[in-house]
Regions:
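C-terminal beta-signal and adjacent terminal beta-strands/loops
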Residues: 2-4, 707-716, 736-784
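Acidic, small-polar-rich N-terminal luminal/periplasmic segments of exported/outer-membrane proteins
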Residues: 3, 32, 52-191, 592
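Outer-membrane beta-barrel translocator/receptor signature
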Residues: 156-159, 170-248, 256-262, 319, ...
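Structural signature of Gram-negative outer-membrane beta-barrels, strongest in the C-terminal barrel
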Residues: 253-255, 394, 413-417, 421-425, ...
Length: 784
């Protein structure tokens, strides 16, 4: 590989590259490494250098855990010299674990997960990710382009998952206060290779993936790659819930090994799932009975129970087309242009419930849970009256131009990255009208065959959201000798969000819609508004390198989320963050830390202390002269994060992380059901680990543990439901054997102790998602 002539610069010429060389690494528990890392370094007789590891079947065994960089050109330095917490989860990690979705891969990042189960009857769908105290599900990107939609993202075409913690507004524009997630897609390369996996397991889990790459004869520097996926799997420990999907991702590249390279990537995915409405919290720890439900104390329902019907469905179609053109003007200057069009369609129906109790003045049951004999548990029924429908289409078109230049001004070296982005994002939510209903079902023995006369169709009461953005950005890293770097970034986003909501007029109560003189049942426009402004986000960091393999850093960053920035919706409510008259939510993050590569730079250790202050929050405790809430609210997340990734020895790989967070509402009303000042759905402590050892015989054994502290649910009017959840620990394991260079059999085991735990809980506390029960997957990995 030909490196740049200017020392220490980051652009690498493609002229002699035949594909990205993989360096074998892994991540270990920070506390264990602190005690043993130096000893291991001294005892390792064969230091695992990149070159050596690539000669001992690292690619065949697939144990590369460590990535040195993220894929975005906006990050001008290797991870070790980047003053920010960024975790990269490589395909070697999530493939070895048998993970198939983004949510499963993110279990390798401490404190990141799907902890929120929705509001009232609305159940969250897809990758509903929380990170460092805030919802990050609308800050998910694919190859640096926002990926819209509440869907579950498959990993069959993903090279690595990049978790950027801390404000990401300078890198991506509007985003969640505490970070963003990027999925890097697989690309065609100059080699002939075929690989894939056949998987079967408990609860009728079946999956097939294939990855085929071929050079094109007669067309020098060209290659084509096709990734395929098929899956039909029930969910372990959940009756009737099913995930069925198919995907194909062809990629073709031209001009590899030349100064000008072109890539065309396509992606098509279909999902036909039976969604999970989760389980009533009746009888579990911290549940207290409402009137008439006293007999249910200590009698939780079976966590496998399914309370939906055969009519429930989650049908998703995702289509994406990407064209990328790269040109190297020299070894020190590269121009990249990326054009993408993408569309996601979702048709969703769920027979949802709210497990309320209560009795009337005569003592008869009046809630959603009813009975004929209070002492006979088999007589209890649960109403399925909160039917949820989604009929949504999201689309995006973008053109991103980036120029990366390395140069020097006197003795100071610069790694400059600058560009412009033009983006249009649209969302259409089709109104759905329903007639009929689903019958109640047994609380302790529900039957999904009990369907009623519920029907639905589009009503015409649609809502439309669109955001157009023009972005300019510049990043520069200044190197003052070998020991000191300063990295800065500045981004300006000129955006315009337009939103129109239509509704069927009429009705009574708080959801009544004024007809304005029109006949009842007429479709009327309730909101037609827009928001337009310029966001300025920036970050500044400094790195001191006492030695080449270590970095000490400090960083400060500002990120903003404007009204409607997360969901394209605007509101005329004075208490809504989506009111276009309000200022953007602003996040300020301070971070100091250290990064150190030990064991001949094969093992990366990381320590970060961080604090994020989120301001311009709605504060109903502080009213203006008109009696309206003000934006004096403030939230804070601060803590420590430890992680490590790499090889302890040539054959011992490990990945682990630990975080301890203190979350709080600094100004404003408490938002938790138990009245504590914490933020909701955010564990204050979490640990994750995964380690494997490869024997010369071809046998690999490994496993890991993950710990998640309890969660505080949100505040609403629900009574008696759990206000918080308990902590839990889960143990997983893997055993594999390479029969030949071409075939490896792998057995994954999850939740070895069959721990029964609450993985997420909804805002009112009526429903919870049980954790995955003990599961086994047997896979055949092949490679030619």
């Amino acid at each position: 590989m030909t490196k740049l002539k200017t020392p220490g610069t980051h652009i690498v010429s493609k002229k002699s590259s035949t594909g990205r060389r993989l360096t074998a690494t892994a991540l270990s528990s920070a506390m264990m490494i602190a005690a043993s890392g130096l000893t291991v370094a001294e005892e390792a007789s064969s230091p695992p250098t990149s070159k050596k590891l690539n000669t001992v079947r690292i690619e065949a065994e697939g144990i590369n855990y460590k990535a040195d960089r993220v894929t975005s050109p906006k990050f001008t330095q290797p991870l070790r010299d980047t003053p920010q917490t960024i975790q990269v989860i490589t395909k070697e990690v999530f493939n070895q674990q048998g993970a198939s979705t983004l949510t499963e891969a993110l279990r390798n990042s401490a404190g990141v997960g799907t902890f929120y189960a929705g509001e009232n009857g609305n159940t969250t769908t897809g990758d509903a990710i929380y990170m460092r105290g805030f919802d990050t599900s609308n800050s998910i990107f694919v190859d640096g382009v926002r990926d819209i939609g509440s869907i579950s993202r498959d990993l069959f075409n993903v090279e690595q998952v990049e978790v950027e913690k801390g404000p990401a507004g300078t890198d991506n524009g509007r985003s969640a206060p505490t970070g963003a997630i990027n999925l890097a897609s697989k690309q065609a390369f100059l080699a002939d290779a075929t690989s894939g996996t056949l998987t079967t397991g408990t609860d009728s889990q079946n999956r097939v993936t294939a990855d085929i790459n071929r050079t094109l004869e007669g067309l020098a520097g060209s290659a084509v790659r096709v990734n395929l996926m098929w899956q039909d799997s029930d969910v372990a420990g959940r009756d009737h819930v099913n995930n069925s999907r198919f995907g194909i991702a062809p990629s073709i590249a031209f001009g590899l090994d030349t100064d000008t390279r072109a890539y065309v990537n396509l992606l098509y995915i279909e999902q036909d799932n039976v969604p999970d409405g989760f389980v009533p919290t009746v009888g579990i720890d911290h549940w207290e009975p409402q009137a008439g439900l006293e007999a249910l104390v200590g009698n939780p329902v079976d966590s496998e129970n399914f309370y939906g019907t055969r009519d429930d469905h989650d049908e998703v179609t995702a289509t994406m087309a990407t064209f990328r053109l790269e040109h190297d003007f020299s070894d020190n200057a590269r121009l990249t242009n990326t054009v993408r069009w993408g569309k996601t369609e979702q048709d969703y129906q769920l027979s949802a419930f709210m497990s309320t109790g209560g009795t009337d003045e005569d003592g008869n049951p009046s809630g959603n849970i009813r009975w004929t004999d209070p002492n006979d548990l088999s007589s209890y029924t649960l109403a399925r009256s909160n039917n949820t429908f989604k009929d949504i289409e999201n689309s995006i078109v973008t053109d991103q131009l980036n120029l990366a230049v390395d140069f020097a001004t006197g003795s100071v070296e610069h790694n400059l990255s600058t560009g412009i982005e033009l983006t249009r994002e649209k969302q259409t939510s089709y109104g759905v009208a329903s007639t009929g209903s689903q019958p109640a079902t047994s609380l302790y023995n529900p039957d999904w065959n009990e369907t009623g006369d519920l029907t639905s169709s589009r009503s015409g009461a649609n809502s439309y959201g669109q955001t157009d953005t023009v972005s300019l950005y510049v990043f520069d890293t200044l190197k003052f000798g070998e020991n000191f770097l300063v990295t800065g970034g500045l981004r300006a986003d000129r955006y315009k969000t337009q939103y129109r909501n239509n509704a069927v007029c009429g009705g009574t109560g708080r959801r009544a819609v004024d007809c304005g003189g029109q006949p009842e049942g007429t479709i009327v426009t309730t909101i037609d508004d827009e928001a337009e402004d310029t966001l300025i986000n920036w970050k500044l960091g400094a790195v001191y390198k006492p030695v080449k393999a270590a970095s000490l850093y400090a960083n400060y960053a500002i990120s903003q989320q404007p009204p409607g920035g997360s969901n394209f919706q605007l509101s005329d409510s004075v208490s809504s963050a989506n009111n276009p008259n309000l200022d953007p939510q602003e996040a300020k993050t301070y971070e100091v830390g250290a990064k150190w590569d030990v064991v001949q730079e094969a093992l990366s250790l990381n320590l970060a202390l961080f604090r994020t202050d989120v301001t311009n929050e709605i504060n109903s405790n502080d009213l203006d002269e008109q009696g309206n809430p003000t934006q004096s609210g403030e939230k804070r997340v601060e803590g420590v994060e430890l992680s490590a990734v790499g090889n302890i020895t040539e054959n011992w790989s490990v990945t682990a992380g630990y975080t301890n967070m203190d979350t709080s509402v600094e100004e404003g009303s408490a938002i938790t059901a138990d009245g504590t000042p914490n933020l909701t759905y955010s564990p204050d402590e979490a640990f994750t680990s995964w380690t494997t050892y490869r024997f010369p015989s071809g046998l690999t054994i490994g496993g890991g543990a993950s710990y998640t502290a309890g969660l505080h649910r949100g505040r609403d009017g629900a009574a008696g439901t759990p206000e918080y959840t308990d902590s839990y620990t889960v143990f997983n394991a893997v055993v594999s054997y390479a029969f030949t260079d071409n075939l490896t059999l792998r057995l994954n085991a999850y939740n070895l102790s069959d721990e029964d735990y609450v993985a997420s809980i909804n805002k009112s506390g009526y429903r919870y998602a049980p954790g995955t029960s003990r599961t086994f997957l047997l896979s055949a990995d092949f490679r030619f």
